[in-house]
């Protein structure tokens, strides 16, 4: 739970986040997780959401890592939700935390077993680089994710290594570090007092009238005169987007399109 300001003209309000800790032990909301193929990750998720909350969403949670190949017990099925007092139909009992195991393997492990040249195993053509994690509680996936429970999970390998100065000549050497920028887009609705609202009973879905990027309404990113890697994620429940880069005169700018739905394309496409 965090006090959050979506825009300077809007009041501070409570949102629900996953909270990690940096190297100094400081809390960090919805941390971007950096992983590598062949290096498993065990993530322990504590649920400290209040049972007597106000507003939309539910304090029962089920963490789902979207699109990665994971064991079924760590997939975050909708029925795997839990809290200190409740548990879903596919959980044995309530609890304070749940461990998630992410082996970080490629698809096709049976067809392409581990070897000296492929220590992670699987089909490296199936590598996924840009993933995200979010809540997937039964009947409340959209509400809980919209309330703030979503973040990035970036996974690297020898080709997409996360190092633009990689000495490996076969690496793509894409922009990295501060120049590799994940951007999560969510459309949201706010009432006349500037408080976020969500109609979780509308079967047709909810379209927001404000677009947030990484939790801020229409933020500005100051950039250097160099190449950037932008990872664009639609983290909202209903809206579709068409993205364009324009200059101050509203003229279209070119960019290189390198991935879709988490996968690198066979070859980059130049937007003209």
Roles of regions detected by a PLM:
Residues 38, 46-50, 233-238:
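Short solvent-exposed strand-capping/beta-turn motif centered on an Asx-Ser/Thr pair
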Residues 70-93, 101, 185-272:
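Histidine- and aromatic-rich segments of cupredoxin/plastocyanin-like copper-binding domains
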Residues 35-37, 127, 224-225:
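Surface-exposed loops/turns
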Residues 8-10, 44, 51-62, 147, ...:
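Short, hydrophobic/aromatic beta-strand segments
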Residues 48-163, 269-272:
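Extracellular/periplasmic metallocenter environments
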Residues 13-33, 209-219:
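N-terminal edge beta-strand
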Residues 157-177:
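Low-complexity, Pro/Ser/Thr- and charge-rich linker/hinge segments at domain boundaries
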Residues 43, 63, 135, 183, ...:
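Divalent metal-coordination and catalytic microenvironments
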């Amino acid at each position: 739970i965090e006090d959050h300001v979506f825009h300077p003209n809007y009041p501070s309000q409570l949102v629900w986040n996953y909270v990690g800790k940096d190297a100094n032990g400081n809390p960090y909301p919805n941390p971007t997780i950096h992983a590598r193929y062949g290096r498993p990750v065990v993530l322990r998720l504590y649920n400290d959401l209040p049972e007597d909350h106000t507003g939309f969403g539910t304090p029962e949670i089920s963490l789902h890592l979207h699109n990665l190949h994971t064991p079924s017990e760590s997939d975050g099925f909708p029925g795997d939700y839990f809290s200190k007092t409740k548990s879903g139909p596919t959980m044995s009992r309530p609890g304070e935390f749940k461990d998630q195991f992410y082996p970080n393997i490629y698809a096709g492990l049976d067809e392409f077993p581990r070897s000296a040249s492929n220590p992670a195993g699987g089909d490296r053509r199936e590598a996924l680089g840009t993933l995200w994690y979010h809540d997937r509680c039964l009947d409340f996936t959209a509400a809980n994710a919209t309330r703030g429970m979503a973040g990035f999970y970036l996974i690297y390998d020898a080709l997409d290594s996360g190092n633009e100065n990689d000495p490996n000549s076969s690496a793509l050497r894409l922009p990295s570090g501060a120049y590799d920028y994940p951007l999560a887009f969510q459309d949201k609705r706010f009432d006349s007092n500037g408080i976020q609202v969500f109609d979780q009973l509308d079967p047709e879905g909810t379209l927001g009238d404000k677009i947030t990027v990484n939790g801020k309404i229409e933020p500005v990113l100051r950039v250097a005169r160099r190449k950037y890697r932008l990872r664009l994620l639609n983290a909202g429940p209903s809206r579709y987007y068409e993205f364009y880069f324009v200059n101050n005169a509203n003229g279209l700018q070119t960019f290189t399109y390198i991935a879709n739905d988490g996968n690198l394309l066979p070859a980059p496409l130049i937007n003209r």
